[in-house]
Structures are given as structure tokens and as C-alpha cells.
Amino acid sequence: MQLQVARIGKPHGIRGEVTVQVLTDAPEDRFIPGTRFVVEPASAGPLTVDSARWNKDILLLGFEGIETRNQAEALRGAKLFIETEELEEEDDEGWYEHELVGLDVRVGDAVVGTISGLRTLPVQDLIVVESPDGKEILIPFVEEIVPEVNVGEKYILVTPPPGLFEINVEDSGETSDAGESGPGEAEPGKAEAGDNA
């Protein structure tokens, strides 16, 4: 099985670098020079990382054999994957976005919404919850607030501090993609409750 970890955006400069929309919570591990990715479409790859650097909040990658802006432009929109077998020796206590989306969000016995997404951020991960009235609520994915994740029973248990749901209601006009601003491809990052607290 393959896991998408990034989507290539626009070229940067004239030497073949590209911007990357990061879809993993461990970019420092996933994009080191020498890393080889399976690519979709297959005609664009495979690709091997030659260089990786950050420009403000945007990850810039260079790939072996990609040396011009035109070559970089041909990669725009390509998706980068790793084999999930590579993750087996890593920590098993995390969850991918596709495992969380659709789970009920419970406060005690009451269902207060449904998970619609996961945002992996440098400081802490955020669970995106859609409330019954259609609002988006952002909940910090830390053990103190999300003490239980039960994928088998399809729910998470939340113990929100006072005012959490009022404070963290998402403005529908706000965007927060780092890297290439695209039409919201929210492929999975892997998150762990309490990891980034």
C-alpha cells in the first residue's frame, strides 16, 4: 500500500526546484536527500530527492535529473508516495487522516459533530470537526482534550475546556495551506494525540 506525502506545486527559480504541498507530519524525515518517491502519474517518476530547503513556510525540493524550470513545470500537480511498509518500524500510536474522517465526536454521551479533516501543523495537530449546523470547529489533537480515539467503534471522545467550541470556530473564508495553495487536497498526515503538545 502507498501513502501520499506531498503534491508538487509550481517551479521555484530556474534550476529545477519546485514548491511542495506537504501532506505528512514528519517532513524532516520524509524529504531528506536520497529519498525515492513513487509518483502519480507514473510517467513523471520515480523521483529521488537531491535537495530540500524551507523558504519561509514553503518546502522547496530539487530532484535528481530535474535541472531546468521547464522540467520542473512538467512535474506540477504530481503526487509523491511512499510505501507504507516503510512505516512499520515507526511508532504505531498514530492515526492517518483517512482513519479519522467520518468518526463521531462525542462529549460524554452526546455527539457534537463529525470529523471532516486533520491538519498537521508544526506546533500541534488540529482535528477539523463539522458541527450539526455546518460550522467547522478546530480541536487541538492532544491527549488532554482527546483522551480516546476508537476507530473500531467510529468515534473520538473529547473533553473540551470551557469555550473551546466557541473560540475555535473556523472562519469559512480562511485558508491555511502551507506551500502551494490549491483546491484543498487534504491527503493524510499521520497524527498522534499529545505528540505536539
UniProtKB/Swiss-Prot annotation:
It comes from the Bacteria. Residues 167-197 are annotated as: Disordered. GO terms for cellular component: cytoplasm; ribosome. SUPFAM superfamilies: PRC-barrel domain, Translation proteins. GO terms for biological process: ribosomal small subunit biogenesis; rRNA processing. Gene3D superfamilies: PRC-barrel domain, RimM. Residues 176-186 have a biased composition (Low complexity). Pfam families: PRC_RimM, RimM. Residues 187-197 have a biased composition (Basic and acidic residues). Binds ribosomal protein uS19. An accessory protein needed during the final step in the assembly of 30S ribosomal subunit, possibly for assembly of the head region. Essential for efficient processing of 16S rRNA. May be needed both before and after RbfA during the maturation of 16S rRNA. It has affinity for free ribosomal 30S subunits but not for 70S ribosomes. Belongs to the RimM family. This is Ribosome maturation factor RimM.
